[in-house]
């Protein structure tokens, strides 16, 4: 517009300020986003905690299951061996029960199966024969094992005890040394008597070239619980 002096006057009207409602809306969304973030983090933490608890519980239950299985197996073993023992007393002969994990003609005692073989062999030949049966010559390091074996034999039997020479220690087939305060050898331990046999409940040294019957031993495995009855 032109004024009285001929100058042009600009009539500029101030622009209306933008609605301030956008700013509160933006703040509201930020608050909501923060709430959702915190909630999500809480959910993740909760899920992780549940996962840890679940894994811990699974490990506990697995350990309990293993303990119960071991206890059941021990009870089953004792019961099975008692069934066999009572049957042998009753029949006065070797008895095989279907609960035994041992092969036919092998006897079940403790954690082992014992094979009594009537083969006249040298000690080395006996050792090899047992190896072929996936076994070793018997170890009678405990009195209970010695008594069990002695009650079931009448003839001389090679066992898994030997030494390299008269200056060396007597050792079992598993490389353990014969304990001085444990089972003792009876008779003379002269030179060239570097292998041992069992007879009449006692262990005797002998020449390894002698020929005798033998006893093999191998791990029994698990008692057949489902065959107890």
Curated annotation (Swiss-Prot):
Ranges per topology, Extracellular: 53-229
Gene Ontology CC annotation, any one: cell surface
This protein's record includes keyword Phosphoprotein: yes
Gene Ontology MF, one: transmembrane signaling receptor activity
Listed CDD domains: CLECT_NK_receptors_like (cd03593)
Cellular location(s): Membrane
Glycosylation sites: 67, 120, 134, 184
PROSITE patterns: C_TYPE_LECTIN_2
Tissues where the protein occurs: Hematopoietic cells, megakaryocytes and platelets.
Transmembrane regions: 32-52
Lipid bilayer topology: Single-pass type II membrane protein
Modification after translation (UniProt): Glycosylated.
UniProt GO BP: cell surface receptor signaling pathway; platelet formation; signal transduction
Keywords tagged on the record: Disulfide bond, Glycoprotein, Lectin, Membrane, Phosphoprotein, Receptor, Signal-anchor, Transmembrane, Transmembrane helix
PTM annotation (Phosphotyrosine): residues: 7
Disulphide bridges, residue numbers: 102-113, 130-216, 195-208
Domain C-type lectin, first and last residues per copy: 109-217
Cytoplasmic side: 1-31
Function, as annotated: C-type lectin-like receptor that functions as a platelet receptor for the lymphatic endothelial marker, PDPN. After ligand activation, signals via sequential activation of SRC and SYK tyrosine kinases leading to activation of PLCG2.
Additional detail: Acts as a receptor for the platelet-aggregating snake venom protein rhodocytin. Rhodocytin binding leads to tyrosine phosphorylation and this promotes the binding of spleen tyrosine kinase (Syk) and initiation of downstream tyrosine phosphorylation events and activation of PLC-gamma-2.
Subunit structure: Homodimer. Interacts (via cytoplasmic domain) with RACK1; promotes CLEC1B ubiquitination and proteasome-mediated degradation. Interacts (dimer) with SYK (via SH2 domains). Interacts with PDPN; the interaction is independent of CLEC1B glycosylation and activates CLEC1B.
Name this polypeptide is given: C-type lectin domain family 1 member B
């Amino acid at each position: 517009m032109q004024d009285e002096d001929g100058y042009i006057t600009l009539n500029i009207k101030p622009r209306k300020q933008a609605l301030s409602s956008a700013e509160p809306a933006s703040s509201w969304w930020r608050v909501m986003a923060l709430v959702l973030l915190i909630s999500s983090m809480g959910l993740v933490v909760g899920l992780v905690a549940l996962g840890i608890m679940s894994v811990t519980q699974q490990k506990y239950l697995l350990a309990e299951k293993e303990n119960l299985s071991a206890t059941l197996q021990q009870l089953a073993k004792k019961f099975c061996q008692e069934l066999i023992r009572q049957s042998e007393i009753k029949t006065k002969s070797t008895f095989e029960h279907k609960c035994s994990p041992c092969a036919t003609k092998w006897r079940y005692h403790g954690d082992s199966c014992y094979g009594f073989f009537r083969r006249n062999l040298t000690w080395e030949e006996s050792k090899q024969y047992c190896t072929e049966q996936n076994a070793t010559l018997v170890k009678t390091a405990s009195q209970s094992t010695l008594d069990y074996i002695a009650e079931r034999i009448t003839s001389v039997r090679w066992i898994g005890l030997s030494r390299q020479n008269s200056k060396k220690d007597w050792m079992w087939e598993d490389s353990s040394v014969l304990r001085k305060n444990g089972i003792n050898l009876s008779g003379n331990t002269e030179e060239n008597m570097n292998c041992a046999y069992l007879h009449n409940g006692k262990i005797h040294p002998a020449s390894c070239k002698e020929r005798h019957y033998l006893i093999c031993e191998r791990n029994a495995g698990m008692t057949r619980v489902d065959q107890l009855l």
